[in-house]
Amino acid sequence: KENAFFFYTVFKNEFKNFILVTDDLSPIEIESANIEIISPVLKKGKYKWMGYFSGEPIIFSMQSTEFKTIVQNGDIEFKNGSSINCFLKIKRQIDNEGVEKIIGYEVVRVNHYFENEKPIETKEGKKHRQTKEAQKNQINLLDDLGLAIKEK
């Protein structure tokens, strides 16, 4: 990577706008991320999972209590290539040089997991999908009503 330097003049009255209150950046949220599981956590506790995301190995915390319970009860058998589709939150910070760094990964919700390449929808995944579909249908209904009212 090449280092590029940009110069910008900051006037005294604007200076306060350039001071960072925190080095935390807003997290990147991915609604439908696929993670291949390398190392699941089969025991209760706040242990970290390992997986592959976008071709890179990652360590992540599993926030989905429903999925953790399914795993701890032995209802899911993990094999080479087992994966999940999930809502992934990527936490970021900015360092002293202004470089963005990833500081953690969190799986907030598991939409579905795969058994023999067949997706199995979780209860929380189904609930989220139905809520999203209902919101979409409401918007479409309101749009249709809006058009009907405008045409009269």
Task: Give each language-model segment a name.
Residues 1-31:
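Charged, alpha-helical interface segments at or near domain boundaries
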Residues 27-45:
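Structural detector for short beta-strands of small beta-barrel domains
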Residues 67-87:
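Short nucleic-acid-contacting surface segments enriched for D/E, G, S/T with interspersed K/R
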Residues 91-126:
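OB-fold/S1-family single-stranded nucleic acid-binding modules
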Residues 41, 81-99:
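A short, charged
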Residues 114-152:
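Extended, charge-rich, solvent-exposed interface segments
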Residues 33, 49, 84-86:
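Hydrophobic residues positioned within well-ordered beta-strands of beta-sheet architectures
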Residues 40-67:
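OB-fold (S1/OB) nucleic-acid-binding surfaces
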